[in-house]
C-alpha cells in the first residue's frame, strides 16, 4: 500500500515538472510579434480593405499594380504589409521536384502569392498553393529547382505573379513570369497586372452575333467562328492542329485591325521558334525601330518547362490580352496552343500537392481550373477577346474528361479527323462532327445556311451508303445514290485547301477564299453544275474558277 502511494506521488511530481517545462517551452516559442498583434485591437475594416486591394478585378486599370521586386536588391526582412506579409523572409525547408516547402516565422503569405528565392543563380519564383500549418507553406516552382538547398532565403512579394502588359509586349516573347526570352533586352513599361484576376461581371459583358471570316472554306461554310467567341480545334497527335492555328493567325491577324496574343502552352519549342520566324517574315512582328508597329505578343511555356510554368502560362497570355481589351478597347485575338497541356500541367501539380486523382487520373479540380481560365475569355462593352484554342484529344477519344470538359465552354468546335487526314485531305476537318452556334439562318442568312445544310446532307448520305458500297460495290446502287456519291466525293475534295504556312512543305501557293465565293461554289456543286468535272480537279484548290482551270489542264494532259 505504501509503495503504491509513493509511486503515485512520484508520478504527480513528474507530471507537474513536465507541465511546467511544456508551458515554459510554449511561452518561449511564441513570437513577440504575435503576442503584440494579439494584444493590439485591429482597426475597424482594416482586413476587409486589405482583402479588397489584394483581389483585383478584371476591369481594374492597368497602372495600379506595382513592379514586382527584383531579387538583386537586398531585402531587409521588414514586413511592409500586415495583410499579405509583404517583405517577410522565409526559409526553404523541403524540395521535392517542382514542390518547395517554405517556413515563415512571421508574415505568412496568402494563397497564390508569389515568392522569390534569394541568392539564386536565376530568378526563381514560387507560387503559394497550400498552407500546411506551423507557419509552413507549400509552393509550386515556376522554373527548375536545380541547385536549391534547404535553408535558402525566400522573399514574400505580397502580390500574385505580376507581368508586364501593354504595347511594350508587342513583337516580344515573354515567359510565365513576364521576363523577355527573345534576347532583345528587358521589356520597358509602367503597366503591370497580376495573372490571377476575376472574370468580368455580368453587367460588363456583351454578346454580338457577328461572323469572323477566316478564308478557310470548310470553317467559314460549315462551322463559322463568332467574333468575340471561343473556338476549339480538336484533334489527336499529328492531324494538323498547329498548322491550322498558324494559318488562322496568318489569315485573320493580317486582315484584323486589333492585336493578337499567342500563348504556347506545353507545346514543341521548335514550333514556337518557327511561328516567331514566320511572323517576322510576314510582317506581323517587326523588329528594331518599327517594333511598335507589331501586331502580336508571344507568351511561351513550352514542353521542357516545369508543370508550374505550364499551368500558369495560359493565364499570363490571357492577362496580356485582357489589358488590350479593357484598357485600350481593342478586339483581341487570343491563340492558345495547346489548352490540353494546361489541364495536363494542372494534373501534375495536383498530384505533386498530394490530392487524390479523379476520373482517368485527372485532378479533382479539373472543371474549376478550366472554368477559371475560360470565363475570363469574354466580350465586354469595352472590347472583345476572340479565342482560338488547339485541344489535343488523347487517343482520339472525345469522351476523355479533358476535352469533354472543354466542350461546354466553346461557341464553335472544329474537329480534325484522322480518317480524313489518311485520305490526304487537308485541313482534315470533319464536316459532320464540327459544330457552331453561328450556323443559323437568322445570323448567316438563308443562302449560307441552306448551302451548309445541303453539303452536310450529301456527306451524311454518302457516309450511310459506304457500308453498302463496301459489301456490294457501286454497281448495286440506284442512279440517285450514284449521283449522291459522286457529288459527295467532289465536295469532300473541294473542302481541301492549300495553306500559306504549308507552302514550304507542299510547294503549292496558299489560298484565301472569300465567304461569298465559297457559298456560290458549293451551291453550284449541289445543283449539279460541275457534275462533268473530275474529282481530281476539286482537290487542293481555292475557288470554283481554279477547279475549272485545273480540269481543263488535266483534260489537255490526258489528251496529249
From Swiss-Prot:
Any one cellular-component term (Gene Ontology): proton-transporting ATP synthase complex
Highest taxon of source: Eukaryota
Enzyme class, first EC level, given as a word: translocase
The name this protein goes by in its record: ATP synthase subunit beta, mitochondrial
EC code: 7.1.2.2
Record's keyword terms, sorted: ATP synthesis, ATP-binding, CF(1), Hydrogen ion transport, Ion transport, Membrane, Mitochondrion, Mitochondrion inner membrane, Nucleotide-binding, Transit peptide, Translocase, Transport
Gene responsible for this protein: ATPB
Role, per record: Mitochondrial membrane ATP synthase (F(1)F(0) ATP synthase or Complex V) produces ATP from ADP in the presence of a proton gradient across the membrane which is generated by electron transport complexes of the respiratory chain. F-type ATPases consist of two structural domains, F(1) - containing the extramembraneous catalytic core, and F(0) - containing the membrane proton channel, linked together by a central stalk and a peripheral stalk. During catalysis, ATP synthesis in the catalytic domain of F(1) is coupled via a rotary mechanism of the central stalk subunits to proton translocation.
Example GO biological process: proton motive force-driven mitochondrial ATP synthesis
Region (Disordered) residue spans: 20-44, 58-81
Residue range covered by the transit peptide: 1-54
Family: Belongs to the ATPase alpha/beta chains family.
Subunit structure: F-type ATPases have 2 components, CF(1) - the catalytic core - and CF(0) - the membrane proton channel. CF(1) has five subunits: alpha(3), beta(3), gamma(1), delta(1), epsilon(1). CF(0) has three main subunits: a, b and c.
Intrachain S-S bonds: none
Cited CDD domains: ATP-synt_F1_beta_C, ATP-synt_F1_beta_N, F1-ATPase_beta_CD
Binding site for ATP: 235-242
InterPro entries listed in its UniProt record: AAA+_ATPase, ATP-synt_VA_C, ATP_synt_F1_beta_sf, ATP_synth_F1_beta_su, ATP_synth_F1_bsu, ATPase_a/bsu_AS, ATPase_alpha/beta_chains, ATPase_F1/V1/A1_a/bsu_N
GO molecular function, one term: proton-transporting ATP synthase activity, rotational mechanism
Catalytic activity: ATP + H2O + 4 H(+)(in) = ADP + phosphate + 5 H(+)(out)
Entry-linked HAMAP family: ATP_synth_beta_bact
Subcellular location, record wording: Mitochondrion; Mitochondrion inner membrane
Bias (Low complexity) ranges: 33-42, 58-71
Native species: Nicotiana plumbaginifolia
